Amino acid sequence: MNGQNIRIRLKAFDHRILDASTREIVSTAKRTGASVRGPVPLPTRIEKFTVNRSPHVDKKSREQFEMRTHKRLLDIVDPTPQTVDALMKLDLAAGVDVEIKL
C-alpha cells in the first residue's frame, strides 16, 4: 500500500478501556512493520442531563447526570498487507467504537 495511510478513530465511555485498545492497536501495527502517529487525544464530549429529583413537586430540587465520550485518533503510515490482516483479526473490547478510513 504505497503512500497510503489508515486513520483509526476510537470512541468509548470508559477511558481505561479506550487506552488499552489503543495500546493493542499500536503494538500490533508496530509488530507488523508499520509506523504509527498518535494516539492523539481528541476533545471529550460531555452531555449533561438535568432532571427533577421528585416526580411532581420541588422544582428547585434537581439532579444532574453526565455522559462522557472519550476519543482517540491513530494514523498508521505506510501499512503493509500483514498490518491490514493483523488489524482485521484484532479483537477489541466491547465498549469501543472503531471507525477506519483508508
Curated annotation (Swiss-Prot):
GO biological process, one term: translation
Gene Ontology molecular function, alphabetical: structural constituent of ribosome; tRNA binding
Entry-linked InterPro entries: Ribosomal_uS10 (IPR001848), Ribosomal_uS10_CS (IPR018268), Ribosomal_uS10_dom (IPR027486), Ribosomal_uS10_dom_sf (IPR036838)
A GO cellular-component term linked to this record: ribonucleoprotein complex
Pfam families for the chain: Ribosomal_S10 (PF00338)
Membrane-spanning parts: none
Keyword entries, A-Z: Ribonucleoprotein, Ribosomal protein
Chain's role: Involved in the binding of tRNA to the ribosomes.
HAMAP family: Ribosomal_uS10
Record family assignment: Belongs to the universal ribosomal protein uS10 family.
Subunit note: Part of the 30S ribosomal subunit.
Protein name according to UniProt: Small ribosomal subunit protein uS10
Organism expressing this protein natively: Sinorhizobium fredii (strain NBRC 101917 / NGR234)
Taxonomic path: Bacteria, Pseudomonadati, Pseudomonadota, Alphaproteobacteria, Hyphomicrobiales
